[in-house]
Amino acid sequence: MQIESTELPGNITRLSLTGRLDMDGTQAIEQKFAFQITTRAGKYVVDLSGVSFLASIGIRMLITSARGQSGRGGKVVLAAPQPLVRNVLETAGIDKLVPMVDSVEAAQATLA
């Protein structure tokens, strides 16, 4: 599991995740992800296009981070999940808690 952070126009931070958000993958990036997303209140796009699998521990990480940002006045948008990952998120009802869109560009528009 890998995480990469890039700055987008509009003071938006893009966190690109690549790999499997299973037990091992989540443990491999959880501290870095939490540090990136809790350093400051802001606008974050979590790019899930590179995530091939999502387990409950990965869902917990995403929800915890989004709630933390919301509590500080920030916002998180999940972007571009692959069909399997989208299905897991929708089945778990995460799309009702955290905005989820089809592309990074749509996420930027949501955060504008």
Please provide the spans of the model-predicted regions.
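Short acidic-hydrophobic, aromatic-tinged amphipathic segments that line or gate anion-handling sites
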Residues: P99-S103
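Residues in well-ordered alpha-helical elements
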Residues: Q27, V104-E105
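Amphipathic alpha-helical interaction surfaces in cytosolic regulatory modules
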Residues: M23-V98
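Acidic phosphotransfer microenvironment of two-component signaling modules
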Residues: P83, E105-A106
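Short beta-strand/loop segment at the start of cytosolic alpha/beta domains
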Residues: M1-S16
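Short, charged, intrinsically disordered terminal tails
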Residues: A106-A112
